[in-house]
Amino acid sequence: VLRKDPQIIEELKECIRRHRSTEAAIDELHEKYESANRDIYYGYIVKLFQIIGYDCRLSRGGQNYERADAILFIGGKAVPIEIKSPGEEKELSVKGIRQALENKIILLARNTYPTDRNITSLVVGYNTPNTRSEVHELIEDIFTAYEIKIGVIGFKALLAFALSAVVDERVSGIKDLENLKGVSHA
């Protein structure tokens, strides 16, 4: 049974009602959380994934065996998630990508949750990297060297998927999320 936060669902619905536009609602929520730190942001990201329809869990801080910030399950397989709050960095950098690789390696090595090498390792950040960022090249280099996919989702894209789930009143997930490599655009 998926846990969906009624308070966040109501916040999304109210934002849509107020603006009558998904884009304006996304902009308002993006701005609202622009200074959020990990204590607020990480849980919010997990709850957005739950609204979209995923079994997603926040890792317990300080647990060495749970390196990833959150774990999402698709078809019984674990997808590690590295989360970067806007308080940590406004635009995703190579640090988050390296941590996503580390999350995947540790998950594969320790077998804490069922997964496989072909499933992506995610990074969720406030803003996606610009097109000239080293992030894009690093994602390709990681795939070339290790055949590990790193997927990147920005806060605006995640909000768009969650708003769509709330407006349409159905859960459809994110198409091919488990195979995402590079930056997702809603």
Residue ranges of predicted features:
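Charged, low-complexity intrinsically disordered tails and linkers
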Residues: 1-19
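Catalytic core segments in nucleotide and nucleic-acid processing enzymes
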Residues: 22-186
